[in-house]
A protein has these predicted regions:
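Class I SAM-dependent methyltransferase SAM/SAH-binding core
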Residues: 119-157, 335-348
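A short glycine-rich, Lys/Arg-flanked "PGG" loop and its adjoining helix->strand segment in the class I
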Residues: 185-200
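Extended interfacial segments that mediate partner engagement and assembly in macromolecular machines
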Residues: 44-142, 216, 221, 288-305
Length: 409
């Protein structure tokens, strides 16, 4: 049953088919960025996470979509600049654009959902003229970095306003944003307004194949109404009157897909074997609940054992996706004393959604010689987190909230 305020999806937003099948139900969860200040008694509202799959275009959908105004308020906390893995991935994206499109000097680059302008700053280093569209308070950060930014949700009217002010961009980028957008049909129309024959579009998002292979069920949080395959993007390109010129698979966020779209590609990607492999995605997703049940049992036992021996544990990092395993494992102050974030994070001073676990600064982290294990909530960037912790003197064991071994039968 649809809950008040939610948008229920009844057909595929990519190809239009009504034959969507349910493949995964993770239960009810708070929004991952609904951060309540420490001491505030407000209780986060929870929304269902049910995944539907389209076997025609191989796209995974949230059955119930939370309105964008609730997901991305002006107080949205995420900032790209605070995660090294994200910044490194952005540099590689810019390098890929130079490799494919040549010298960027003087080119107009528009980043939709530009957040704090981190990607635009890298483009600017290469001589590009930089523009952004960003609905949250992060737009102020991007503007302060010297980029021309429209503080609004992306849509046809905003696209028309952009063209009136700045003309059509040469390159349009979406980095982990295309999955966040509420009304895909409206986005397609807006992109048609922005594009001219020479415009290239570069989209990077979580790849459904990597999510399946690495059991990354925690990426199915409310901010991602859709998760895409290469097949998905072939349909999206056709809707735009474009072609998929190339497809890459960066090892970012645990496995991304990066597609390069153009109106008349010099070379067109020939992903036939890839598209054939994606035919099994629906059945693979339908098998995921059994694997998740094994993870839940093993991780619950591992954390309970550590807590029984050491008392409540400290945890490192709160990426929004961690809200899902935290809820599914029933973690609270009895098991996790606090989660520590890099100084300057907007999450500090709040509690983890759906819990009373405080998010504190790394500067408040307890003695580095403490031999208690620590729980890493950012398991998808485990190497970065471990290097950071060891560099700060932490010598204890690290329990990753999700590990591939947890899913083994």
């Amino acid at each position: 049953m649809n809950e008040p305020g939610l948008i229920e999806i009844s057909k595929c937003e990519v190809c239009g088919t009504a034959a969507l099948r349910p493949v995964l139900d993770l239960g009810a969860h708070p929004m991952c960025d609904d951060l309540v200040p420490i001491g505030d008694i407000r209780v986060c509202r929870e929304y269902p996470i049910e995944i539907l799959f389209c076997d025609r275009c191989r796209t995974a959908h949230q059955r119930f979509q939370v309105p964008k105004q609730d997901l991305f308020p002006s107080t949205y906390h995420y900032r790209s600049r605070q995660t090294l893995d994200v910044l490194n991935g952005m540099r590689r994206l810019v390098d890929a654009c130079i490799e494919k499109y040549g010298d960027l000097r003087g080119k107009k680059v528009l980043d939709v959902g530009c957040n704090d302008g981190s990607l635009l700053s890298i483009f600017a280093e290469r001589g590009a003229r930089t523009f952004g569209i960003e609905p949250t308070g992060a737009a102020a950060d991007a503007s302060a970095s010297g980029h021309a930014v429209l503080n609004a949700f992306f849509g046809e009217e905003v696209a028309e306003d952009f063209v009136r002010r700045f003309g059509e961009p040469d390159i349009i980028t979406f980095t982990n944003v295309f999955a966040h957008i509420e009304d895909l049909a409206a986005v397609i129309r807006a992109l048609k307004v922005l594009s001219r024959q020479q415009t290239r579009i570069v989209i990077e998002n979580h790849y459904l194949g990597a999510i399946i292979a690495r059991r990354q069920f925690d990426t199915f949080y409310h901010e991602h109404p859709r998760t895409y395959s290469a097949t998905s993007f072939s349909f999206i390109a056709a809707a735009l009157g474009m072609v998929v010129a190339d497809v890459e698979f960066p090892d970012r966020y645990g496995g991304n897909i990066r597609v390069f779209l153009s109106h008349s590609a010099e070379t067109v990607a020939a992903p036939s074997p890839l598209l054939e492999r994606e035919r099994a995605f629906g059945d693979d997703l339908a098998c995921m609940p059994e694997a998740i049940a094994r993870w839940r049992e093993k991780k619950t036992s591992e954390i309970r054992s550590a807590v029984a021996q050491h008392g409540p544990l400290a945890a490192k990092a709160f990426p929004g996706r961690a809200a899902i395993p935290i809820k599914m494992l029933g973690l609270d102050r009895a098991s996790i004393d606090a989660i520590y974030e890099k100084p300057g994070s907007g999450k500090i001073g709040h509690v983890v959604p759906g819990t009373r676990i405080p998010i504190l600064s790394d500067n408040d982290f307890p003695a580095t010689k403490d031999d208690k294990p620590l729980v890493n909530m950012a398991w998808h960037i485990a190497d970065e987190i471990e290097t950071y912790l060891r560099g700060r003197g932490f010598a204890g064991d690290i329990i990753h909230i999700i590990s591939l071994g947890d899913f083994a039968a």
